[in-house]
Swiss-Prot record:
Domain HMA: 15-80, 82-148
InterPro entries for the chain: ATPase_P-typ_cyto_dom_N, ATPase_P-typ_P_site, ATPase_P-typ_TM_dom_sf, ATPase_P-typ_transduc_dom_A_sf, HAD-like_sf, HAD_sf, Heavy-metal-associated_CS, HMA_Cu_ion-bd
Protein name (record): Copper-transporting P-type ATPase
Chain's gene name: actP
Catalytic residues (positions): 515 (4-aspartylphosphate intermediate)
Length: 827
């Protein structure tokens, strides 16, 4: 993913700009950043994800990336700045340095660039996530110089380093805060747990010194470890855009400030209200810091799937140079390099085997546990593991072009997307924090006016509890964390969700429509029958038909040509070849006009096929696909091919039925053949004799009655139907997959992956609903309790300390629930 790219082929369509943001803590932050970005002229849309801490901005017209970054900073947040070191090739003088620096600084998202001629390195400071090496490389190449490509591991290392530093900082803050809060808590509340503590304090340091000591400890906690809340919360308050940090600041400052007045000028307070709440302020900060620490740890675990994918690629490869295999940095491997792989080693890049044979474990890519045999001309995938033999292969795709790199980009894109279910959360969080502040003010006023004596103390404590217990974080994390873990688990199972939205739409599917050839079947048909008409010799017909089919790319053509070769029948030259999709092929072979195709092709050309009606019925009833051959305008033969059903297909259909789905087969075969196959497999509906362009109409027909349709095909020939369906699922294997043609991609050819994807979709949406239910119920129920609605009933009041603990744990609960998807088992 480059920093700036067109979302479609047309240059008039919106451009996209991605970057990482620091400082967001809750759903209100997300709303605020999105609002700030959307206000920038030229911005078409802004999508900010709290879990990934990433923004995706689309522009209409000329992109104003600098204005977007300034808007984010003005809103109180910081685009994350990272440093990249890249090797520049071809520089010879200071002018080269200036030229390269200028080119790099022009890349959207680059804050600064410094180039060193002596080391031939460029140090680039850029907004994290906004520009990858590919974008920088394009700029340098445009200036006339070369650049060494980076690996995805480098970008991941930056993210890991950032999270490690954040965890270290939070751990330190929790430790310091706890060490100061514990004695403070004992000074104020110790007598409730340990008899004699109060008398001991009175007899040693006295009440006045006790208050001074509490003041000192609470102040150190608030403006030491707790300073992070003030740095973010106060500016947002001043901008009238409060967030969760603002709620913490208001609550703790109110408790601390009231206590300061009690300590130093108690005379100004009403009689009986001179109480201190230092321990509440300190414990609130400490508990929320603990929650942040646990939350940060959990967030790191949600992205482990991406880290594992990045970690699949080795750092070096043994490349053939001058007759010897030399260990080479992976960044220096180029297309065409010959690479040696020994048993147990990881395959570094995509390629084609040139020598040797082995079995390769591709489970980390396809989800299939059985090793795949590789021999000369076999394709190998970067990141997979060589098991037994030694092989040599030629690199065909390297760097960001490898299948592994594509998978990583797809998973990242899916994890950063928003589901339709998120819309409600966005609407609520837009006003959540301001409403909580208003609720706290109303709580204070109600208790001050209507509460028992001392009214001021009751008013303060309950208002602080309301401010502290409200948790927009849980609402903001509810959806994106489940998406992150769910799509990550899907990748481990060999399932790629190209769009996060497909997680929700797939769950709603009623009918699964399956293309027969290559999906239900192996896609490798075999010639089973050839019955010649009177006056024609079978071998003569096969020679003419096979010769014609050598120019066709259809799988059936390959079956006919292969059968001719196995019988020792040589093919001859063809002229005037013509292929009509859905009908057949025609041409001139040895001076004779030959036509091969479905019954409709011959009927269209006025050729009577009734002479083979009985044969056609027999072959079709056996699940074979009959074709006809005409020579010089006469019916010459009926040919039958059979495409074996995949071993996994029957179980896959049973699994889909078990999930409550109807299964429909869409095929170009005649109805008799299609129904025979459907009956054998237990398929519910059949749409037969469909031309390639008719698959879209077939999907529309299946959708009648308000049904949601998922269409499964090979992702290339079925592209229009995949696009028309509510969910398009492409089934492929390895590098043959057409990733861009569907919403969901199954990396293996096993149709059981569809049932796994559906089950995971249902589990993920269920997990999201659980999170949202918790987040909303938590806030709807506990905010009124914190305000004191139960006090008139049974005298219950919620301490600000318990409010802080509940708030801290609410986000951890959401993250913990989302992490359960890591162990999802579709079996």
């Amino acid at each position: 993913m480059t920093a700036l790219k067109q979302t479609e082929k047309s240059t008039s369509l919106p451009m996209s700009f991605d970057f990482d943001i620091e400082g967001m803590t809750c759903a209100s932050c997300v709303r605020r950043v999105e609002k700030a970005i959307a206000a920038v002229p030229g911005v078409a849309s802004a999508n900010v994800n709290l879990a990934t801490e990433r923004a995706t901005v689309q522009f209409n017209g000329v992109p104003e990336t600098t204005s977007v970054l300034r808007a984010v900073e003005k809103a109180g947040y910081a685009p994350r700045i990272v440093t990249e070191e890249i090797q520049i090739e071809g520089m010879t003088c200071a002018s080269c340095v200036s030229r390269v620096e200028k080119a790099l600084k022009a890349v959207p998202g680059v804050a600064d660039a410094s180039v060193n001629l002596a080391t031939e390195k460029a140090t680039v400071r850029l907004v994290s996530g906004s520009a990858e090496i590919s974008a920088l490389a394009a700029a340098v190449k445009g200036a006339g110089y070369g650049i060494r490509k980076a690996t995805p591991a480098e970008a991941m290392k930056e993210d890991v380093d950032h999270r490690t530093a954040e965890l270290r900082s939070l751990k330190s803050a929790v430790t310091i805060s706890s060490l100061m809060t514990l004695p403070l808590f004992l000074l104020e509340m110790g007598s409730h747990f340990i008899p004699g503590v109060h008398d001991f304090i009175m007899g040693t340091i006295g009440m006045r010194n006790n208050l001074y000591l509490q003041f000192a400890l609470a102040t150190l906690v608030l403006f030491g470890p707790g300073l992070r809340f003030f740095r973010k919360g106060v500016p947002n308050l001043l901008r009238w855009t409060p967030d969760m940090n603002s709620l913490v600041v208001l609550g703790t400052t109110a408790a601390w400030g009231y206590s300061v007045v009690t300590t130093f000028v108690p005379a100004i307070l009403p009689s009986g209200t001179a109480n201190v709440y230092y321990e509440a302020a300190a414990v609130i900060v400490t508990l929320i810091l603990v929650g942040r620490y646990l939350e940060s740890r959990a967030k790191g675990r949600t992205s482990q799937a991406i880290k594992r994918l990045v970690g699949l690629q080795p750092k070096t490869a043994f490349v053939l140079h001058s007759g010897e295999f030399v260990e080479t940095e992976i960044t220096e491997v180029v297309t065409g390099d010959v690479i040696r792989i020994r048993p147990g080693e990881k395959i570094p890049v995509d390629g084609t085997v040139t020598d040797g044979s082995s079995y390769v474990d591709e489970s980390m890519i396809t989800g299939e546990p059985v090793p795949v045999q590789k021999a000369t001309d076999s394709a190998v995938i970067g990141g997979t593991i060589n098991k037994t033999g030694s092989i040599t292969f030629k690199a065909t795709k390297v760097g960001s072009d490898t299948l592994l790199a594509q998978i990583i980009r797809l998973v990242e894109a899916a994890q950063g997307s928003k589901l339709p279910i998120q819309a409600l959360v966005d609407r609520v969080t837009a006003w959540f924090v301001p409403v909580v502040i208003l609720a706290a003010l109303l709580t204070f006023a109600a208790w001050y006016v209507l509460g028992p004596s001392p009214a001021l103390s009751f008013a303060l404590v309950n208002a602080v509890a309301v401010l502290i217990i409200a948790c927009p974080c849980a609402m903001g994390l509810a959806t994106p964390t489940s998406i992150m873990v769910g799509t990550g688990r899907a990748a481990e199972l060999g399932i790629l969700f190209r769009k996060g939205e497909a997680l929700q739409s797939l769950r709603d599917a009623d009918v699964v429509a399956v293309d027969k050839t290559g999906t239900l079947t192996k896609g490798r048909p075999e010639l089973t029958d050839l019955v010649a008409a009177e006056g024609f010799e079978p071998d003569e017909v096969l020679c003419l038909v096979a010769s014609l089919e050598t120019l066709s790319e259809h799988p059936i053509a390959e079956a006919i040509v292969s059968a001719a070769k196995s019988r020792g029948i040589a093919t001859v030259a063809v002229s005037a070849f013509e292929a009509t999709p859905g009908f057949g092929v025609s041409g001139t072979v040895s001076g004779r006009r030959v036509l091969v195709g479905a019954d409709r092709a011959l009927v269209k050309n006025g050729i009577d096929i009734t002479g083979f009606a009985d044969e056609a019925e027999r072959l079709g009833s056996g699940g074979k696909s009959p074709l006809y051959a005409a020579i010089d305008g006469r019916l010459a033969a009926i040919v039958a091919v059979s495409d074996p059903v995949k071993e996994s297909t029957p179980q896959a259909i049973k699994s889909l039925h078990a999930l409550g789905l109807k299964v429909a087969m869409v095929t170009g075969d005649n109805r008799r053949t299609a129904e025979a196959i459907a009956k054998k497999l237990g398929i519910d509906e059949v749409v037969a004799e469909v031309l390639p362009e008719g698959k879209v109409d077939a999907v529309r027909k299946l959708r009648q009655g308000g049904r949601s349709v998922a269409f499964i095909g090979d992702g290339i020939n079925d592209a229009p139907a995949l696009a028309e369906a509510d969910v398009g699922i492409a089934v492929g294997t390895g590098t043959d997959i057409a990733i861009e043609s569907a919403d969901v991609v199954l990396m293996s050819g096993d149709l059981n992956g569809v049932a796994k994807a559906l089950a995971l979709s249902k589990a993920t949406i269920r997990n999201i609903k659980q999170n949202l239910f918790w987040a909303f119920v938590y806030n709807i129920s506990l905010v009124p309790v914190a305000a004191g609605v139960l006090y008139p009933v049974n005298g219950t009041l919620l301490s600000p300390i318990f409010a802080a603990a509940a708030m801290a744990m609410s986000s951890v609960f959401v993250l913990g629930n989302a992490l359960r998807l890591k162990s999802f088992d579709p079996a």
